[in-house]
A protein has these predicted regions:
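N-terminal Lys/Arg-rich, disordered targeting/topogenic segments
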Residues: 1-11
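Low-complexity, intrinsically disordered/propeptide-like segments
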Residues: 7, 21, 25-27, 189, ...
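A broad, low-specificity signal for short, low-complexity segments enriched in glycine/proline
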Residues: 11-12, 16-23, 71-79
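N-terminal start-of-chain detector that recognizes signal peptides
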Residues: 12-13, 26-27, 88, 282-283
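Short, polar/proline-rich extracytoplasmic segments that appear immediately after membrane translocation
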Residues: 14, 20-61, 324
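Long, domain-scale functional regions
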Residues: 59-336
Length: 336
């Protein structure tokens, strides 16, 4: 028996521990780093300077999950056309989004029911681009103004401030630790949404050299603030949530059964704020209307409020560890 151990029982426990670790390593459930700079207790009486640091692997990365699930549960691959008029490059060309009315994208976040919009290439505030899971709260946190001062500049909007201060502070510490920083694109347009989701996706991301028609005067083209991680959905997020059979422009979603209600999981039959600005005036933004279409909303401040559904992107180290995405067994998240 090794003299470091008091008796045969302790030695056997040590051997069994090593065998267990070896099996887990072979199965890929854990990984390890070897070091001789720290102490670890193998038993109540034995210390060793040479230790193995164990890292438990749980779940799949966002991209691994998407590639395994694409074509099932309503998850579909979308490919964008990228050109030099946009703030994004070829790394953003491929997304995976949940589409239609019959989707299994329920996820538990902050001990609440949220939904997965998709696995989307996302740029953080340091300029890193990774495939990350974008989620939206299943229900509204209430009806509010987009901006209490009557401006369609999202960086200074009162709703933006509320979401990243008052609302953020209601989240659990676990939930806060799962949220990654995100660059938000603030482009819009200067007429009714008589264009498709693909076109709107590009409008939302127009760069500074091509800002005319997509931003009101000097409104910023994006928000790159590490302290503002939470926003609301893009018009294109709502558009892509419709069935693949939906070919209508966003404005006419209300008139196409393939685009709304039972064929669009984001349609709640409620006026709901969207992120894009209406670039033709200072106090107008886009929203989903009561009948499922998307149009400029003049209620940004003057005459009313709309539902608010917080949206955020999880950090890249957050993985889906269990569940099947149904409302009965929503996906569960873990940090690796």
């Amino acid at each position: 028996i090794n003299p470091l151990f008091k008796d045969i029982k302790e030695y056997n426990k040590y051997l069994l521990s090593l065998i267990g670790i070896f099996v887990l390593l072979l199965s890929g459930i854990i990984s390890y780093n070897y070091t001789n700079t720290s102490y670890a207790k193998w038993s109540s009486s034995v210390e060793s300077k040479n230790i193995i640091k164990i890292h438990i692997k749980t779940g799949k990365s966002a991209l691994e999950f998407a590639q395994a699930k694409v074509g099932t549960d309503g998850l579909e691959q979308i490919t964008h056309t990228i050109d030099d008029t946009l703030q994004v490059d070829s790394k953003f060309a491929t997304e995976y989004r949940y589409r239609g009315g019959n989707v299994n994208n329920y996820v538990t976040f902050n001990n609440e029911t949220w939904r997965i919009i998709g696995i989307i290439p996302t740029e953080d505030t340091d300029g890193n681009v990774e495939n990350r899971t974008k989620i939206i709260r299943d229900t509204s946190v209430g009806d509010m103004y987009w901006d209490g001062n009557g401006s369609n500049n999202w960086t200074t909007a009162t709703l933006n401030t509320y979401l990243n201060n008052d609302y953020y502070n209601t989240l659990s510490s676990d939930a806060k630790n799962m949220i990654g920083t995100t660059k938000y694109y603030l482009g819009g347009y200067n007429s009714n949404a008589s264009f498709t989701s693909d076109v709107m996706w590009q409008y939302e991301r127009k760069n500074e050299a091509n800002r005319t028609g997509y931003y009101y005067r000097t409104n910023p083209i994006m928000q790159n603030d590490a302290n503002k991680k939470i926003a609301i959905m893009y018009a294109s997020d709502y558009g892509y949530a419709a069935s693949k059979k939906c070919t209508s422009s966003l404005y006419y979603y209300y008139d196409d059964t393939n685009c709304k209600k039972t064929n669009n999981w984001l349609d709640k039959s409620a006026g709901t704020w969207l992120l894009p600005q209406y670039s033709g005036d200072y106090d107008v933004t886009f929203s989903v209307n009561l009948i499922g279409g998307v149009d400029p909303n003049y209620k940004v401040y003057v005459s009313g409020e709309n539902a608010v559904r917080p949206v955020l992107s999880l950090s890249s180290n957050v993985k889906i560890s269990s569940g099947n995405g149904t409302s009965e067994q929503p996906y569960q998240l873990s940090i690796s």
